[in-house]
Amino acid sequence: MNKAEDLWNILTWLGVENRPFYRFRSTYCVMGGYGGYKVVGHKNLESLNAELNTVMLRRKKDEVLDLPPKIHSTEYVELTKKQQIMYRDIKNGIIADLENILTSVNPLSCTLRLRQLTGGLFTEENPKLERLMDMLSEENIPNGYKALIFSQWEKITEVYYEALKEYNPAYIVGKVSPEDREAEKERFQNDPECKLAIGTIGAMGTGFTLTKASYVFFIDKAWVSGDNAQAEDRAHRIGTEDTVNVISLVAKGTIDEGIEEYLIENQDLFDRVVDGKGSKHDIRQVLNNLLKI
């Protein structure tokens, strides 16, 4: 349970929430997407936390569980010449339209094609995939270890799924039914021939125990650090026996580097812009840093 709207039933049952669902959701959820029916972010979280604190005793995982360590590292790749040209053209288009973007409903959506380009869409050349394949071999994935591979987008997961079929991967994305997702999870956990689980951060990043994985690879990251932490913790929970190595694939000199920096150093500013609360100055600052303008 990772969305504010999911708490309404529990809080109502406990007797601490008396508002109808639609009012609860409008208080704590940022709506967007087609028709404004999709939850795209959260707001008023201090108020929600205050409500939760009346009925919840929180303990951090590292305070109550004796788990193996989790090690984070970054693996850098270089875009190909063709990708660099495409990246520059897309970036220049964003810069040319920047004043309109600053006042748009979802300003960060302008970076979508840049992010997908670094992940391997739009060209046959894919440095991240090539490096990942080398690393899978180097890390002895064929000899007993298993790995999770995450992306934000189904289109990118499809590319990696097709390229890595030799590892008999499980596949968990939004279009896969709940029953089949569960079957894929069981296959990854119990079938020694299933070496990889490939999925989206949204679908595979919550609600699953995937403790057979010793490695977690991010092709790209979610805007919200908590979503990435949830995803990597599919492998780092009760039942984990080995050290979990979390590896982020980052294209040098691109928006990938900017996102990594914000997730580590300035999540508050990032969150304001993602949640639609950022000022025009905030949005400009974030885009300038992401695009290295």
Tell where the protein language model's regions lie, with residue ranges.
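Conserved P-loop NTPase motor "coupling/switch" region that bridges the ATPase
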Residues: M1-E63, T240-T243
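Conserved nucleotide-binding/hydrolysis micro-motifs of P-loop NTPases
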Residues: M1-K3, C29, K81-Q84, E154-I156, ...
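SF2 helicase motor core recognition
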Residues: N2-A4, I156-Y161, E182, K195-D220, ...
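Coupling/hinge elements of helicase-like and P-loop NTPase modules
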Residues: F21, R58-I71, L102-T103, R272-H281
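Conserved helicase/translocase motor-coupling segment
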Residues: V64-K165
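Conserved helicase ATPase core of P-loop NTP-dependent helicases/translocases
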Residues: L148-F150, E158, E166-M204
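A conserved SF2-helicase RecA2
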Residues: W223-I293
